[in-house]
């Protein structure tokens, strides 16, 4: 993608941050003028690599780029800046010459995210600059969600409970999917809502067809449904007539029907 488009992204962010315009969610108008962006400490640890050269060419102002995506994440998870948003004050973002893709570490008030220059180079080889920008944004949305999402209560933690893990990874990919961060062809029938990542994420994103604010309400359910469970949260958000099994079966039927058509 041409640099001019990236500069347009930068201009759009600066304009939106300085304007009085509101974000409309369903029938509720939400102002984000008071949202406090964290400090972004961007460090290049992959100097001299092809991946870094590609990243630096495509994203000339990473601070602005990262903050733009932060706003997209919090607007997907919350109604306004007055909500109970984790108070992330600093993000250490590094480009590193390592295998893998990306990962988030730490917690409030300071988190760290690394992104692999090797993955950038691989993406470039698979689809040019457009693929790099698409993949970089999608991966960033996922990792930023880990910083800003709420966590299930009363069921252990990420390493000890599969439901907790499935929620965390599923919501991160749901936010990514909701903001156009995956190819549409990635959504396929099969699996289980407990599989996490894209399998869970696409399912949760599909549930916005039941309620446009589903992802916000599902995120907030972690504070209201204790001990937390998928079925308990579904009933809390959509009503007692719904169940996780029933909605999953409906979702699978929808995917299968679309695949045949």
Question: What feature does the model see in each segment?
Answer:
Residues 22-23, 56-114:
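Auxiliary, metal-adjacent structural segments of Zn-dependent hydrolase domains
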Residues 159-200:
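Post-HExxH zinc-binding segment in Zn-dependent metallohydrolases
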Residues 1-4:
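Positively charged n-region of N-terminal signal peptides that target proteins for export
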Residues 34-60, 118:
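Acidic/histidine-rich, surface-exposed loop or edge segments in extracytoplasmic proteins
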Residues 200, 207-261:
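Pan-zinc metallopeptidase signature
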Residues 119-140, 155-164:
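Short pre-active-site segment immediately N-terminal to the catalytic Zn-binding motif
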Residues 15-16:
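C-terminal motif of bacterial Sec signal peptides marking the signal peptidase cleavage site
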Residues 138-151, 169-173:
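Active-site recognition of the HExxH zinc-binding catalytic motif
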């Amino acid at each position: 993608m041409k640099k001019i488009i990236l500069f347009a992204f930068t201009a759009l962010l600066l304009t939106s941050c300085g304007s009085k315009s509101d974000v409309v969610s369903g029938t509720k108008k939400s102002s984000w003028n008071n949202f406090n962006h964290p400090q972004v400490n961007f460090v290049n640890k992959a100097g001299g690599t092809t991946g870094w050269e590609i990243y630096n060419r495509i994203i000339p102002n990473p601070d602005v780029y990262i903050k733009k995506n932060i706003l997209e994440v919090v607007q997907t998870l919350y109604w306004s800046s007055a909500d109970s948003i984790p108070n992330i004050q600093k993000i250490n973002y590094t480009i590193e010459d390592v295998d893998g893709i990306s990962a988030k570490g730490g917690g409030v008030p300071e988190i760290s995210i690394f992104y692999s220059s090797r993955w950038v180079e691989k993406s470039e080889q698979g689809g040019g600059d457009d693929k790099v920008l698409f993949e970089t944004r999608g991966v960033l949305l996922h990792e930023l969600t880990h910083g800003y999402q709420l966590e299930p209560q009363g069921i252990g933690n990420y390493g000890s409970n599969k439901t907790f893990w499935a929620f965390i990874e599923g919501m991160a990919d749901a936010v990514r999917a909701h903001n156009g961060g995956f190819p549409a062809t990635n959504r396929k029938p099969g699996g289980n809502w407990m599989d996490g990542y894209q399998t869970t994420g696409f399912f949760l994103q599909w549930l916005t067809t039941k309620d446009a604010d589903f992802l916000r309400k599902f995120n907030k359910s972690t504070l209201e449904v204790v001990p937390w469970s998928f079925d308990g949260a579904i009933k809390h958000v959509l009503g007692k007539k719904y169940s996780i099994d029933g909605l999953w079966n409906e979702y699978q039927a929808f995917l299968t029907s679309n695949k045949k058509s």
